[in-house]
Amino acid sequence: LGSTTMNWVRQGPGXGLEWLVSYYGPSKNAYAPEIKDRFTASKDTSNNIFALDMKSLKTEDTAIYYCVGQRNYYYFDFWGQGTMVTVTA
């Protein structure tokens, strides 16, 4: 992961891609307003882990979540395989 900017995006059922967070460093991150107080991204470079802690989940959080690496300012370079998260009432 190194100095790569990491991001989380998601795709809900029948919806387009939605940006959630860009991780620039331990205290330099940008969050989408709808998840800012509920989701927290963290990066462990030594173990190549980029995590998303999600709390107070809502049914509308149901989606496939992708971690995405960004070495170039203008586009996402590489994508994780995605993880399906289903939230039921």
Swiss-Prot record:
Region (Complementarity-determining-2), start-end ranges: 22-37
Biological process, per Gene Ontology: adaptive immune response
Region (D segment homolog): 70-73
Transmembrane helix keyword on record: no
Region (J segment homolog): 74-89
Cellular component terms (Gene Ontology): extracellular region; immunoglobulin complex
Region named Complementarity-determining-1: 3-7
Region (Framework-2): 8-21
Keywords of the record: Adaptive immunity, Immunity, Immunoglobulin
Region (Framework-1): 1-2
Top-level taxonomic group: Eukaryota
Region of interest called Framework-3, as start-end residue ranges on this chain: 38-69
Positions of region (V segment): 1-69
Pfam families reported for this sequence: V-set
Name of the featured protein: Ig heavy chain V region HC-3
Organism of derivation: Heterodontus francisci
